[in-house]
C-alpha cells in the first residue's frame, strides 16, 4: 500500500508502478522450482541462508534508493528499485524450502497442525503488516522499508546461528531435468489435474 508514496519523488506512471509491484511475484514464481531443487540437492540450510541474505540485500537496496534525493528525470533510481524488487522476489522463493524444513523436523501425526500454525502466522502478517507499516510511515515514509531490512538481517543471524541442516546427505537428490524446473510446465500439470480442473 505504501509503494506509490515511497516512489512519489520519481513521479512514476501507473504502468511503472504495476511492473514494479509485479516484478517481485514474477521473480518468485520463476525461481521457486529451482530453489526447491537446489535445497533437495545441496541441503536446506545453505539455500535458505543465501536467500535470506538476498532478501537483506534487496530490501536494503530499496530502502537506500527511496531515501536518497535524486535528480529529476533520472532513470537510475527506477532501475535500482526494479533490481531490488527482483532480488527480493528471487529470495522469496525460499518459502517452499522453509516448508520443507518444517516437514523434515515434524512427525507425520503433527505435520498438519504445524503447517496450520504457519498459515496462521502468514495470515497475521498480511493483516498486521499494512497497519504497522502505516504507523511507521507517519514518522518517515521510508521507515517501514528500513525496519523490514532490519528484521531480514535479524532473520539472517538466526538462520546462520540456529538453523540446523534438516536434510541429511543420504536423502539428497540429483538436480532434475530442465523441463521439471520450468514453472509454466509445473503450472500446466496442476491445471490439468482433474480436481483442480473442476474448480
Question: What is each of the regions a protein language model found here?
Answer:
Residues 1-25, 196-199:
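Helix-loop boundary and gating motifs at the non-cytosolic
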Residues 25-33, 93, 126-127:
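Residue-level signature of mid-helix packing/kink "hotspots" within the transmembrane helices
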Residues 118-161:
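Helix-loop-helix hairpin linking two adjacent transmembrane segments in secondary transporters
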